[in-house]
């Protein structure tokens, strides 16, 4: 059968208007919602090719001004692209008549979500068939759109309805709408609720004052998503969701920050962004008083007090505070790598790793530190780097009071108190505190050495060792001690050296109270108390507390004497013996 002809659509049909008295009944939230819905509708029509007129009503909408003095003077336009002739009349104190078939009732009922959602009203005496893709003008403002990009679908149509849809419609007056709005307020007793909301959902018990509202609510339980995007086939429950979704395809970002010019697809995101400029933090934790800009951050923070980790991995039993962390973790089990490089085809599990990899092709590092000139590809890396200059350490250990610049370092540190080592090697059973250590360890089994020196061709298992090696070619020692001017290749060496000047000994033995400057010395000392000797000689099975002692012992089997005296040519197996020998030559 041939497709039905497109019906004429009047722009007047998509405008909801009020008298001055009706406008006065609306609170600020309802007026704001009205403005957003109308502007959303206008933008949708424009994006679909409608030559929508922009009279004074629309001008006032865009500028957030009062609307009750505006009189509608709008002419018709068509989906087929006929030219519209805007007609603007002088503002008067009397406002336009409110259309009984408008969606005012829906706007008020849905004001809390601040979304323009399409209501499907039902009149028991009225069942209207509408041609597919063409909705009757005047039934609902959001339905009057061209069906080129959006379509309405329903799975349970009778055979004779294959070309039509059933639209449930009810006439709603402003008084009905305001009554429903008031009846949903706080302080109502159960009897009043039952009288005002006679239509009850059998699934969840929620009450509604109108039958059409109950029907629409029951779509949630039924899983009905009648609005489908013709670009990708995604289905949505509400028209407003389709409108927002379409911006993914069009790239439209209609909400622009007047402070910095950044644009957003949703007004909600703009509102949150503007708090960066205003410093507003409306979400405050009752436990500790910490305030947050975003509600999502506030909810995540609250979980640190409740210790709730609602996202549980069924594969390994690990639980997570955040759905994003859970989703990333699940990729470990599934092996899924969502982010693929268009240049070399390499795939990545995490978006941040993918972005960092892309820099190897583009060389782009847009985040510049004004203090030292260092650049970064990720804003998060830049933020962490800035803490070096500011000295900020936002992550403090509740056990020992030690503070950390990076969250990852803080998490690893906490495991020194708990003894937790959640990352286990499947080859040898060795466990690690963090995933990066496990990845590096796995290279022992695989023999992988991904870091190759372009100067000499030497390859390395660890990135840190590779960086240190590169400095042997450049001679660069970027870390200089301000006390004695000694320079170091590595930050770890620099940190250990600084303890000579400060006298800091952060590693304290719980058994005997002895303190150490270096973590390696602390670990070796602890083995005196535990009796642990993990390093065993394969030749004679003798065991040692540390790897250094094993290395020296192995020279008794190999005969290696790496320490040679420049004065007399004598060689030694141990550095201590070599140092003692040199004193013979230096004696006066």
Curated annotation (Swiss-Prot):
Record gene name: ZNF599
KRAB domain mapped to chain residues: 9-80
UniProt-recorded name of the protein: Zinc finger protein 599
Chief place where the protein resides: nucleus
Outcome of substituting residue 178 to F: De novo variant found in a patient with intellectual disability
Pfam families documented for this protein: KRAB, zf-C2H2
Nucleus found in the keyword field: yes
Function in brief: May be involved in transcriptional regulation.
Zinc finger region(s), C2H2-type: 199-221, 227-249, 255-277, 283-305, 311-333, 339-361, 367-389, 395-417, 423-445, 451-473, 479-501, 507-529, 535-557, 563-585
């Amino acid at each position: 059968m041939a497709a039905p002809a497109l019906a004429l659509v009047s722009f007047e049909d998509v405008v909801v208007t009020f008298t001055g008295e009706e406008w006065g009944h609306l609170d600020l939230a309802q007026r704001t919602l009205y403005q957003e819905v109308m502007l959303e509708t206008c933008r949708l029509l424009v994006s679909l090719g409608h030559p929508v007129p922009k009279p004074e009503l629309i001008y006032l909408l865009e500028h957030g001004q009062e609307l009750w003095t505006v009189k509608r003077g709008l002419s018709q336009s068509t989906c087929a692209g006929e030219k519209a002739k805007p007609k603007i009349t002088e503002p008067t104190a009397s406002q336009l008549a409110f259309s009984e078939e408008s969606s005012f009732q829906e706007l008020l009922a849905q004001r809390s979500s601040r979304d323009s959602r399409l209501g499907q009203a039902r009149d028991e005496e009225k069942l209207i068939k509408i041609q597919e893709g063409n909705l009757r003008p005047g039934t609902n403002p959001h339905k009057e759109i061209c069906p080129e990009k959006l379509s309405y679908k329903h799975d349970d149509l009778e055979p004779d309805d294959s070309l039509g849809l059933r639209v449930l419609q009810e006439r709603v007056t402003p008084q009905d709408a305001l009554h429903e709005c008031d009846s949903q307020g706080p302080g109502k007793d159960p009897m009043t609720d039952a009288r005002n909301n006679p239509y009850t959902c059998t699934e969840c018990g929620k009450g509604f004052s109108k039958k059409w509202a109950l029907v629409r609510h029951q779509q949630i339980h039924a899983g009905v998503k009648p609005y489908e995007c013709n670009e990708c086939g995604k289905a949505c429950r509400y028209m407003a969701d389709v409108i927002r979704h379409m911006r993914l395809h069009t790239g439209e970002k209609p909400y622009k920050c007047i402070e910095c010019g950044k644009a957003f697809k949703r007004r909600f995101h703009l509102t949150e962004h503007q708090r960066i400029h205003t410093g507003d933090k409306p979400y405050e934790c009752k436990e500790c008083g910490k305030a947050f800009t975003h509600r999502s951050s506030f909810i995540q923070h609250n979980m640190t007090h409740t210790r709730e980790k609602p996202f549980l991995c069924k594969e390994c039993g690990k639980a997570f505070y955040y759905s994003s962390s859970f989703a990333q973790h699940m990729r470990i089990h599934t092996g899924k790598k969502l982010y693929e490089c268009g240049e070399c085809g390499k795939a990545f599990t995490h978006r941040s790793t993918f972005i960092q990899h892309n820099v190897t092709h583009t060389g782009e590092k847009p985040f510049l530190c004004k203090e030292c000139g260092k650049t970064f590809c990720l804003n998060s890396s830049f933020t962490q780097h800035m803490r070096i200059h500011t000295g900020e350490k936002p992550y403090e250990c509740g056990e020992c009071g030690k503070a950390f610049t990076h969250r990852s370092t803080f998490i690893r540190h906490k495991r020194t108190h708990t003894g937790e080592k959640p990352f286990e090697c499947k080859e040898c059973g060795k466990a690690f505190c963090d995933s990066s250590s496990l990845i590096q360890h796995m290279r022992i089994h695989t023999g992988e050495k991904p870091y190759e020196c372009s100067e000499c061709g030497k390859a390395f298992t660890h990135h840190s060792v590779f960086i240190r090696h590169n400095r042997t070619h450049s001679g660069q020692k970027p870390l200089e001690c301000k006390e004695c001017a000694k320079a170091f290749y590595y930050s770890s060496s620099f940190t250990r050296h600084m303890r000579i000047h400060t006298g800091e000994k952060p590693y304290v033995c719980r058994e005997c109270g002895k303190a150490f400057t270096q973590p390696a010395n602390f670990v070796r000392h602890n083995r005196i108390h535990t009796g642990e000797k993990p390093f065993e000689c394969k030749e004679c099975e003798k065991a040692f507390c540390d790897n250094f002692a094993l290395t020296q012992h192995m020279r008794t089997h190999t005969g290696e004497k790496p320490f040679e005296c420049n004065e007399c040519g004598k060689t030694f197996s141990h550095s201590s013996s070599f140092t003692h020998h040199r004193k013979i030559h230096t004696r006066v």
